[in-house]
Amino acid sequence: GDDAVVQPWQRFTDGRFLYKNQLDYGGNTLMGNIKPANTPYTYYTISRLGNPNISWETVEKRNLGIDYAFLGGAVAGSVDIFNDTRTDILVKGSDRAIASYFGTDAPYANLGKVSSHGYELELRLNHTFNNGIRAWLNTSMTHAVNKVKFRDDAPLKPDYQKGAGHAINQVYSYIDHGNLATWDDVIGSPVWTTGNDAKLPGDYNIVDFNGDGVIDADDRAPYQYSTMPQNTYNASIGAEWKGFSIFAQFYGVNNVTREVNFPTFRSTAHVAYAEGDYWTPDGSATLPAPRWGTTIDQAASGTRYWYDGSYLRLKNVELSYTFQKSNWLKKMGIKNCRIYLNGDNLYMWTKMPDDRESNTGYSSSDGAYPTMRRFNLGIDITL
């Protein structure tokens, strides 16, 4: 909708009324830096400007869908194509292109614009053979791509530093280009803003993306894809025969980038994983030289922990048997009895070095807990 926020009880998660000015007060403040003196007066300042025109974001949706079925329902499915344009998206004051000398936090404003498009495909197959076996297959695929059209970026920023023109949650990273092989490479490399004196042969050669001779936050560039997959796939296949049934479900994603390293629950890295392929002067390894607690710049890891987050997971398999109506079930007062054996998260095909479920977040700190593999043996009884 596009209803203006006019009710005083409508608040946002930071607990502030975005359409009201925020006042701060204090006293006994030192005035000036020469012969300072306290003032006995209480002062008031506007710490955040309100915006009385705050409203809900709006969306314009365009969809085209087709449902189909053939051969008496043996082949069925659907095709959906969509195109959305969202406008008036709320932009935080800290994300706005406001000069530092403005004097206070900029107000929230409905400035953002995002477009997205894609399609959804579904195919269902169902057939019963002459010998009584019923087999079925359900598959689906979703392709969704979004792009930030406007985000109130500073107009003089290079395009690669802007949010506009890129996907939501686009990965930004320092880019590494091989290793610093010799001391000459170290001396001739761009300056790190932190820990430059700690650079050694074997460290990553970080690309000075903007060419100013310094490695800083302005050298973080778009890398690979967003942390949200562009494509998702789902397939379920099963069969039934004389009370027996078997079922398997696969799930996969691609065109996604994820961060994976190996912290323990106390945020300490596992050395065997982190340094198992460390750099040596012959240049045979792909990782940097190991260190003994030396503080180095945050840029030093480059793209080391960013991986192609594509995977195909065997998410669930189940084998079951449902007892047919029999006298012994009736004698026990049981209408239906089914026994089953199933397993979850049985296998995953991926280029990532570890099994991290995507819904735990894209970063390693969110996904440090491993995906659990489970097996269940049970019985369902209906009285």
What positions do the PLM features span?
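Transmembrane beta-strands of outer-membrane beta-barrel pores
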Residues: D2, I81-T87, L125-H127, M141-K147, ...
